[in-house]
UniProtKB/Swiss-Prot annotation:
Its cofactor is FAD. InterPro entries: DAO_C, DAO_C_sf, FAD-dep_OxRdtase, FAD/NAD-bd_sf, G3P_DH_FAD-dep. Its EC number is 1.1.5.3. This is Aerobic glycerol-3-phosphate dehydrogenase. The gene is glpD.
Amino acid sequence: MSLSTLKREQIKKDLKDQEFDVVIIGGGITGAGIALDASERGMKVALVEMQDFAQGTSSRSTKLVHGGLRYLKQLQVGVVAETGRERAIVYENGPHVTTPERMLLPMHKGGSMGKFTTSIGLAMYDRLAGVKKAERKTMLNAKETLEKEPLVKKAGLKGGGSYVEYRTDDARLTIEVMKRAEEKGAKVINHTKSVHFTYDSNEKVNGIQVEDQISNETYPIKAKKVINASGPWVDEVRSGDYARNNKQLRLTKGVHIVIDQSKFPLGQAVYFDTEKDGRMIFAIPREGKAYVGTTDTFYDNNKTSPLANQEDRDYLIDAINYMFPDVNVADEDIESSWAGVRPLILEEGKDPSEISRKDEVWEGKSGLLTIAGGKLTGYRHMALEIVDLLSKRLKSEFGLKFDKCATKHLTISGGDVGGSANFDKFIEQKVEEAKSYQIDESTARHFASKYGSNAEELFKIAQTAQYQETGLPLDIYTELVYSIQNEMVYRPTDFFIRRTGKLYFKIDDVLNYKEQVIDVMAGLLGYTNIEKEAYTKELQIAIDEAQTGNHQPAVKE
């Protein structure tokens, strides 16, 4: 067992009893990356997350490990080069959560992308991002473009470009990084909120006071250094520190909608112009659905649950019907949706899409280190930068010496599959192995492709599972038990949203099996009646919010 919910009390005891080199506030991809880098260098690491891991921005993205093509349009050449390098590393270290996918870029008369400039742009992108030969761009005429995706608007079509993006499961990427950090010695816990900082006699930060959001217990965590990696909450967290700088975040909201392929039979991922504002958005097929996004609007409301409002849904439906006019989707065709908040660094006078996605590290007089901004793709490099600085400070202030960054070739949990080139072969081997556990081929394939080298753990659970009396199918029961024992799942929403993505891509499973899942969790985790009622209600609210056009203004009223 690694990140086991069943070991929660022991983890809390370790957090109370030990002094750490660093405690990290925030369990999204940024915090997870820092925990992995620091623990791999030999540092004693603690991490707390007030909600579930990846519950903020890190489960609400476009679910792409970008190569950074959009930054080329803004002539951010260095960003494209670094993003391309990092994308290759992310893929190599975790091919079970990252998949190369051909993206079609249709070009229309009067659109933002001309054929000549697109060809040059994609060629530059291939070079800067270090794209593998087999994945380099190809230019297409109108006929070839329609062969790739017949639903694309024919009127004014000049041709298209085809290039490769990498599709990911952002929340699973985060949890796999977190699990590897724990294997390297980090003590990590979710549903635990940092309430305030503690200071030594020289007014230097020397830890945090936390509150368990499940039991309401409060306790201190002692650490030589504190890193604030709380994403959209960065400003709130450091407002509790007396020594903050005058920089601040500007939040923008991005919304995605999900439509069944029976209504929107998209065969190919497409990156396309919108009619209204000239922005570009994605339409991506996944697991029998097509998801479309994203919007980009300023946001200053509830950060814990940003919602897709009717205006967001209308914008995306209009965009689909503009680029795919034969489809005729309507609001009632939306099965599910999600909204995320981007924690960008404020740049006065810029539109949401113009604000840089770069990250910055801020150091307060108290010694508090804060990391702000950044992108999913760059998580490893962001961690490298801040842990280099942390290492420097631990040496100068405490005389401690640590190794250099060693995450470039470090697989994440589940990533020990013999490299990305071997992943397909690995899956076939696992499917064969599963026969000895009496597991059918499609279940075995699902476990192997989703959990990588951890698949055998699921095979073992499935082999002895007494699942029939629970009313759950074998795959859902197995994943539920695995996620409680290894991925710190405590609430039904943790399981249905962030460990499995079912609320977005298989909402029927949530609707059909929610009561049975809650019953199994109540039995395994010892829910009180009050907890069971609260978590049932919380899940129903999440379902309602995903399915409907919510009234949520951009700014609190």
